[in-house]
């Protein structure tokens, strides 16, 4: 009975107000920059090429190499980002890229972005890093269930999530597939790991992926 009353109270409170939209100027991917780092992979089929990233640790290595190769821009989109070994490594390399002048755009769904508001605020201070949270919850909480309950008054938002996972470097190469940014997606968790695949993509498909990223980046959610 007590739990029922708590839920009812949360629904009543959250129904009193709506999430206020923030008007942001549209932004778009930059033109493809020179990327000699990938010449060996594009030689056979320069217009488009694919490389399967089946092994988790190798996929992480390719991801870090791609970030380190960036000279102009990185656009990263993910559903889940844990700041464990994997997530911290990716973030460290992204910050280093931004430090050398690369424009970094980060788009993360808000479902599991728990307890990281201070980190996001710190990233906001970097002149070359811009992040956006897709469909952010109005009422912040560090627990998944607590956040769901506190936002029951906006039920139409709860399951409107972004599951895309992509990283586009210099609008020349991209990594796209099923891996979120967490140890269990790269074979580094000591208890259990997911089995996922990705593609390292070059050529004309990258521009299509950039268009998709821009659509989500500029979306009102």
What is the predicted function of each stretch?
Residues 32-70, 80-221:
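HKD-type phospholipase D/PLD-like phosphodiesterase module
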């Amino acid at each position: 009975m007590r739990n029922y009353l708590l839920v009812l109270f949360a629904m009543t409170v959250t129904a009193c107000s709506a999430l206020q939209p923030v008007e942001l100027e549209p932004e778009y991917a930059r033109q493809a920059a020179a990327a000699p780092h990938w010449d060996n992979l594009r030689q056979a089929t320069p217009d488009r090429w694919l490389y399967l990233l089946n092994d988790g640790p190798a996929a992480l290595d390719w991801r870090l190499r791609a970030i380190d190769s960036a000279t102009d821009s990185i656009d990263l989109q993910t559903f889940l980002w844990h700041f464990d070994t994997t997530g911290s490594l990716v973030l460290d390399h992204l910050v280093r890229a931004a430090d050398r002048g690369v424009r970094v755009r980060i788009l993360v769904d808000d479902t599991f972005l728990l307890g990281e508001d201070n980190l996001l605020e710190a990233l906001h201070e970097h002149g070359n890093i811009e992040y956006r949270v897709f469909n952010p919850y109005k009422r912040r909480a560090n627990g998944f269930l607590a956040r769901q309950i506190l936002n029951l008054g906006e039920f139409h938002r709860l399951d409107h999530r972004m599951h895309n996972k992509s990283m586009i470097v210099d609008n020349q190469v991209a990594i796209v597939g099923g891996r979120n940014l967490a140890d269990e997606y790269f074979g580094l968790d000591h208890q259990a790991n997911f089995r996922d695949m990705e593609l390292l993509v070059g050529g004309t498909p990258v521009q299509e992926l950039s268009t998709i990223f821009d659509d989500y980046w500029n979306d009102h959610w």
